[in-house]
């Protein structure tokens, strides 16, 4: 991110972080109450 700003944890409630064994795997976006949209490479 170039020129980005820090934000409060509650400002972007649709963003998701997927972790496994304390390591960040991928990011995602909530598209409704039950579904998270991720990139295809996150499934590996």
UniProtKB/Swiss-Prot annotation:
Contains 6 disulfide bonds. InterPro entries: Peptidase_S1_PA, Peptidase_S1_PA_chymotrypsin, Serine_Proteases_S1, Trypsin_dom. Enzyme activity is markedly inhibited by TLCK and PMSF, and moderately by SBTi. Platelet aggregating activity is strongly inhibited by TLCK. Keywords: Blood coagulation cascade activating toxin, Disulfide bond, Fibrinogenolytic toxin, Hemostasis impairing toxin, Hydrolase, Platelet aggregation activating toxin, Protease, Secreted, Serine protease, Toxin. It is found in: Secreted. One of its GO terms (cellular component) is extracellular space. Its EC number is 3.4.21.-. The active site is at 41 (charge relay system). Pfam families: Trypsin. Disulfide bonds join 26-42. The keyword Disulfide bond applies. GO terms for molecular function: serine-type endopeptidase activity; toxin activity. It comes from the Eukaryota. Expressed by the venom gland. One of its GO terms (biological process) is proteolysis. Monomer. Thrombin-like snake venom serine protease that coagulates fibrinogen by inducing a fast degradation of the alpha chain (FGA) from human citrated plasma, and a slow degradation of beta chain (FGB). Potently induces platelet aggregation in both platelet rich plasma and washed platelet preparations in a concentration-dependent fashion. Shows amidolytic activities. Belongs to the peptidase S1 family. Snake venom subfamily. This is Thrombin-like enzyme F202.
């Amino acid at each position: 991110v170039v020129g980005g700003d820090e934000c409060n944890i509650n400002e972007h409630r649709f963003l998701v972080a997927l972790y496994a064994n304390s390591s960040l795997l991928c990011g995602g976006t909530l598209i409704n109450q039950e579904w998270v949209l991720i990139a295809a490479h996150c499934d590996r």
